Amino acid sequence: MLILPIVKGEYKKDYNLKHLTWFKVGGNAEIFFKPLDSEDLKSFLIQNKQKLPIKTFGAGSNIIIRDGGIEGVVIKLGQNFSNIEFIDNHLIVGSSCLNYNLAKFCQANAISGFEFLVGIPGTIGGGVAMNAGAYGSEFKDIVVQIEAIDFAGNFLTFTNEEIGFKYRSNNLPKNLIILKVIFKINKGDSENILLRMNEINNARSSTQPIKERTGGSTFANPEGCKSWELIDKAGLRGYRIGGASMSELHCNFMINNGDATAKDLEDLGNFVQQKVCEDSGVKLEWEIKRIGRHP
């Protein structure tokens, strides 16, 4: 018998995650949990005596939920974890804050260095987890430290150096939930910041399928080259499996054309990975996470 910890937040059983993802595919979470606050989350983790499997969920922008759903508990940090505040010349930002919202906040307050976030879908916590970056900047350039909690309910802090940022990854422990991110502040000019953000938005709209059901870049760039160039060279621009295809506009983006399953998308990515390796001798590494059970 499944015994859930007593919490102040919200549980939902057999919860459909599809509508929370950008691809709009996937199965259900056995248990979906939105904690009220950090102490509520800590209480849940300490009480998790059955050691229910735990997955964390952000904005659903770079993830494929497999069609068989997710066993155990999916934890999503809601609006209570999205605050932005000034403390001692630093920004303290809740991990569920959207990258776009932080970029707009910084522009309004003449804080430079965050312009690139306007072009990165997802949350601040997810951005730290994968060292997200675009247009010449990455999270490693602006993060001072993070506050987090492990699955045993211990609050922890990690400095930029301790995080160990790498290209699209880091050295943080796996069983960790990021709660807050502390950023350094560099003052700038609001008008210049806005101009740069507009440049980024214009570049995205002209080169990426941002109006489609997509999950961002499918594969990380190998050292010294671009994934899209290798995919294009292998003749896979527009290639389709079921309801999923590689974008004609930017062939490192997968698209759900309306009737794709999670299996279609994952099969397409695996096929592209195989064909690029055969064509160029380079094995592309997934940037999009795939989690859950196969049906």
From Swiss-Prot:
Pathway terms, separated by semicolons: Cell wall biogenesis; peptidoglycan biosynthesis
One Gene Ontology cellular component annotation held by this UniProt entry: cytosol
Coarse class of the protein's main subcellular location: cytoplasm
An example Gene Ontology biological process: regulation of cell shape
Active site (UniProt): R168, S217 (proton donor), E287
Chemical reaction(s) catalysed: UDP-N-acetyl-alpha-D-muramate + NADP(+) = UDP-N-acetyl-3-O-(1-carboxyvinyl)-alpha-D-glucosamine + NADPH + H(+)
PROSITE patterns: FAD_PCMH (PS51387)
Pfam families tied to this protein: FAD_binding_4, MurB_C
Keyword list, A-Z: Cell cycle, Cell division, Cell shape, Cell wall biogenesis/degradation, Cytoplasm, FAD, Flavoprotein, NADP, Oxidoreductase, Peptidoglycan synthesis
Top-level taxon in the UniProt lineage: Bacteria
Domain FAD-binding PCMH-type intervals: 24-188
GO molecular function: FAD binding; UDP-N-acetylmuramate dehydrogenase activity
Keyword Acetylation: no
Cofactor(s) needed by this chain: FAD
EC number: 1.3.1.98
Annotated compartments: Cytoplasm
InterPro entries: FAD-bd_PCMH, FAD-bd_PCMH-like_sf, FAD-bd_PCMH_sub1, FAD-bd_PCMH_sub2, MurB, MurB_C, MurB_C_sf, Oxid_FAD_bind_N
Function according to Swiss-Prot or TrEMBL: Cell wall formation.
Family the entry assigns: Belongs to the MurB family.
Name under which the protein is recorded: UDP-N-acetylenolpyruvoylglucosamine reductase
Organism annotation: Rickettsia rickettsii (strain Sheila Smith)
